[in-house]
Amino acid sequence: MGGLSIWHWLIVLLIVALVFGTKKLRNIGNDLGSAVKGFKDGMKEGETPADAQQLPRSGAVDVNAKETTRSDSNKA
């Protein structure tokens, strides 16, 4: 008597389906599945090494080009 049997769970499921309706429960299931998928994709994206990620080239400074310009101006 202390535990819940399968019949208790079926009655609870039936009451929940009557209260919320099957369409609402289906939407909740779809939203939950999308959230889990998004979380897994985010975790996979976070596991990629930092040096493997492509950094944007805009605003990047080429250090070697600056050094060669300095050495060329000293020769003149």
UniProtKB/Swiss-Prot annotation:
It comes from Burkholderia cenocepacia (strain HI2424). NCBIfam families: PRK02958.1, tatAE. GO terms for biological process: protein transport by the Tat complex. The keyword Transmembrane helix applies. Residues 64-76 have a biased composition (Basic and acidic residues). Part of the twin-arginine translocation (Tat) system that transports large folded proteins containing a characteristic twin-arginine motif in their signal peptide across membranes. TatA could form the protein-conducting channel of the Tat system. Belongs to the TatA/E family. Gene3D superfamilies: 1.20.5.3310. GO terms for molecular function: protein transmembrane transporter activity. The Tat system comprises two distinct complexes: a TatABC complex, containing multiple copies of TatA, TatB and TatC subunits, and a separate TatA complex, containing only TatA subunits. Substrates initially bind to the TatABC complex, which probably triggers association of the separate TatA complex to form the active translocon. It is a single-pass membrane protein. The chain crosses the membrane at residues 1-21. GO terms for cellular component: TAT protein transport complex. This is Sec-independent protein translocase protein TatA. Keywords: Cell inner membrane, Cell membrane, Membrane, Protein transport, Translocation, Transmembrane, Transmembrane helix, Transport. It is found in: Cell inner membrane. It comes from the Bacteria. Residues 40-76 are annotated as: Disordered.
